[in-house]
Amino acid sequence: MAKNKLRGPKSRNVFHIASQKNFKAKNKAKPVTTNLKKINIMNEEKVNRVNKAFVNVQKELAHFAKSISLEPLQKELIPQQRHESKPVNVDEATRLMALL
């Protein structure tokens, strides 16, 4: 029954030194985390500022697109009534296509 037991002195635990706690490392880590928190706060502020700028640009673009889309429709309705008297303006059509 006792054949599986090792004879002689027991080997020392290899992980003995690695398992010891170092309390000084925790004290050194605290300033790093506070600096990281400050960096994260600054990054969040920058992201919020950029997001607000993009929202404003999107609103302006939507407003601009609506005004452009309404103007050609109003201009096209009037010339359709007098289509026979006026030739087609290719330059104006090219400019409108470029705006799209």
UniProtKB/Swiss-Prot annotation:
One of its GO terms (cellular component) is nucleolus. It is found in: Nucleus, Nucleolus. Keywords: Acetylation, Nucleus, Phosphoprotein. The modification N6-acetyllysine is found at K21. The keyword Phosphoprotein applies. One of its GO terms (biological process) is ribosome biogenesis. The modification Phosphoserine is found at S19, S69. Trans-acting factor in ribosome biogenesis required for efficient 40S and 60S subunit production. Associates with the pre-60S ribosomal particles. This is Ribosomal biogenesis factor. It comes from Homo sapiens (Human).
